[in-house]
From Swiss-Prot:
Glycosylation sites: C41
Extent of the signal sequence: none
Effect noted on mutating G40Q: No effect on glycosylation
Alphabetic keyword roster: Antibiotic, Antimicrobial, Bacteriocin, Disulfide bond, Glycoprotein, Secreted
Intracellular or extracellular location(s): Secreted
UniProt-reported outcome of changing G42A: No effect on glycosylation
Cited Pfam families: Sublancin
GO cellular component, one term: extracellular region
Name of the encoding gene: sunA
Modification comment: Production of active sublancin-168 requires at least one thiol-disulfide oxidoreductase (BdbB or, in its absence, BdbC). Membrane translocation and cleavage of the precursor are probably performed by SunT.
Gene Ontology BP annotations: defense response to Gram-positive bacterium; killing of cells of another organism
Gene null: resulting phenotype: Loss of bacteriocin sublancin 168 production, but not resistance to sublancin.
Entry protein name: SPbeta prophage-derived bacteriocin sublancin-168
């Protein structure tokens, strides 16, 4: 079981883009923004705002 877990160093976390959001989360926000809210849950405008705030 220990082999399944990877030790994450603080430097790795600091180098991640997105203020704590991962690439997959930012990609989901971008997709919601680009689709005008027709894909995924939530409105397009809120997704765009969150993407600009947390993923740029």
């Amino acid at each position: 079981m220990e082999k399944l877990f990877k030790e994450v160093k603080l430097e790795e976390l600091e180098n991640q883009k997105g203020s704590g959001l991962g690439k997959a989360q930012c990609a989901a926000l971008w997709l919601q923004c680009a689709s005008g809210g027709t894909i995924g849950c939530g409105g397009g405008a809120v997704a765009c705002q969150n993407y600009r705030q947390f993923c740029r």
